């Protein structure tokens, strides 16, 4: 499986940075923001963060997210991609090998529907009213 089989690279380019997260050898979570680029081959290359702890290679998460504040209050344009996988070091970068993905974009699935679908009762309700919405 290639990166582009799991991750929509066009949508990924809409994000400006990623938050690299892992669990250290003592069992504590550690997170650091880092820049990223896509290689010509469609590989996700994270700028190697300068951190004083050992970065594991076998299991990391990278959160790419965006949110726009509304001056009068509230938020819009919310979206995220959470990619779990492995990394290898490559010329000052960490090459991400995606294994799992979860994502949400409110332009695709509005927030109220996301909340309703997250709850079993909400899913049943949406299924029951869907025919009347499509009519």
Describe each region flagged by the PLM:
Residues 1-135:
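Binding-site signature for planar aromatic cofactors or substrates
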């Amino acid at each position: 499986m290639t990166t582009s089989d799991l991750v929509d690279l066009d949508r990924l380019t809409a994000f400006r940075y990623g938050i690299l997260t892992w669990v250290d050898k003592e069992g504590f979570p550690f997170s650091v923001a880092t820049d990223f680029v896509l290689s010509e081959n469609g590989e996700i290359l994270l700028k190697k963060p300068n951190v004083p702890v050992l970065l594991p290679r076998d299991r990391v998460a990278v959160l790419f997210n965006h949110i726009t504040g509304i001056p009068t209050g509230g938020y819009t344009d919310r979206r995220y991609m959470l990619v779990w996988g492995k990394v290898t070091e490559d010329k000052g970068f960490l090459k991400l090998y995606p294994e799992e993905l979860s994502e949400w974009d409110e332009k695709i699935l509005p927030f109220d529907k996301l909340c309703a679908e997250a709850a079993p009762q909400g899913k049943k309700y949406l299924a029951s009213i869907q025919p009347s919405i499509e009519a």
